[in-house]
């Protein structure tokens, strides 16, 4: 299993790449180590059949993401952000007949999604009701921007006791 440290180091490398040429950069990086990164993606990602099964579950909400998983804040123009989000949305519409109302920012910290990206998502309120970022913490009365709601990124470092800490904070 990939440790949190290794995950964060790989994440750091990815975030430093030119986002519009990310796939070329990753291909060069992983090919240098003879790693088939698409095989790992196929192993870990949901199949469209699995998406259809989850779609039938009452306790499951399937949300949207982007097409390429770019660091949105590093994209040169807000139109690039909107294109990424819309393309990801259209994939879900076409492949799974899904019309998600929740969006999750790739990476999701303030370094990868900030006011420009929140505003871009809020301009798509005909599709989305809210968007979440991985900045940790519960939704409280301080979380007033529905296109910048916090979520907890779970890793093997999170224990049940860690999660209970969030339960003690007032949630709206």
What residue spans do the PLM features occupy?
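Metal-dependent polysaccharide deacetylase catalytic core of the NodB/CE4 family, i.e.
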Residues: 1-111, 149
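C-terminal active-site subregion of NodB/CE4 polysaccharide deacetylases
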Residues: 67, 73-172
């Amino acid at each position: 299993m990939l440790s949190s440290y290794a995950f964060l180091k790989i994440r750091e490398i990815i975030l430093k790449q030119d986002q519009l040429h990310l796939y070329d950069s990753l291909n060069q990086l992983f090919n240098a180590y003879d790693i088939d990164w698409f095989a790992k993606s196929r192993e870990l990602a949901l199949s469209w059949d699995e998406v259809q099964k989850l779609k039938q579950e009452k306790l499951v909400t399937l949300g949207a993401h982007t097409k390429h998983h770019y660091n949105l804040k590093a994209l040169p123009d807000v139109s690039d952000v909107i294109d990424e989000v819309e393309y990801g949305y259209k994939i879900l519409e076409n492949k799974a007949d899904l019309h998600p109302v929740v969006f999750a920012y790739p990476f999701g910290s303030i370094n990868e999604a900030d006011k420009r990206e929140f505003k871009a998502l809020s301009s798509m309120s005909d599709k989305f009701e809210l968007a979440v970022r991985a900045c940790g913490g519960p939704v409280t009365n301080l979380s007033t921007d529905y296109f910048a709601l916090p979520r907890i990124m779970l890793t093997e470092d999170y224990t049940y006791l860690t999660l209970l800490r969030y339960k003690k904070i007032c949630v709206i």
